[in-house]
Amino acid sequence: MTNQSTIDKLIEMRLTAMADAFRIQMDDPTMKEVPFEDRFGMLVDIEYSNRKNNRLKRLIRQAEFEQPDASIAAIDYQSGRKLNKALISRLATCEYITEYRNIFITGATGSGKTYMACAFGMEACKHYYTVRYVRLPDLLLDLQAARDSGTFSTVLKKYTKPVVLIIDEWLLLKLTEAEARNLFELIHKIRKKSSTIFCSQFRESEWYQQICGGESTLADAIMDRITYDSYKIDIESIDPSKDLSMREVYGLDPAMAK
């Protein structure tokens, strides 16, 4: 069997990284002195790393992060915000995912909620968990459209399948009865089967009022399913008069680019 035939078969089996590495080995005279087991191990390592990297890129792309460059390592703890660094570091290990626990991130507009949620999502991707980011307004529209078209169960799977679901702009506007009902179906399906990261401008104590004015039993049903055993991060301002928004800190504010 010729070397080219071997390369062609590797490519046919979609072992392209291994094929490229094998070609490089064949062109390198010094590799003739390397034992076969070592050379073969090098080829396997290259193919393995390539597949891992491609898988990570695919997970990040499919997550549709609002801020795909977010990083736990880049979180600014000196920006006038009170942050629990120990808790953030613990959550970055993704242990909460294996425990099926949720994360609540609350804070004012521009406090860095979305950035932090996406940073947690990125860490989940690095652990090869599936993640999906969605704004609650878009989620509600998607669920209602599916309800109207008779495809609710199919669309619901789009949000129940990921191991980590990030819901941004959580309860920014009060829910109608129909919206709360659709949302309850989702929350009920993913409870203790996956983890959800909620980002909200409102404190947890105010969420009841945002769900049908707190009058519907759906408010109790939803809150009961998401609050138990959840981790809570409240991004508090130490000195509002000196604060920069996190959009400015991370260079995400279009006005800063002018």
What is the predicted role of each segment?
Residues 70-94:
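N-terminal pre-Walker A segment at the start of P-loop NTPase domains
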Residues 100-116:
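Walker A/P-loop nucleotide-binding motif
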Residues 101, 128-130, 161-164, 192-198:
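Loop/turn-to-beta-strand initiation segments
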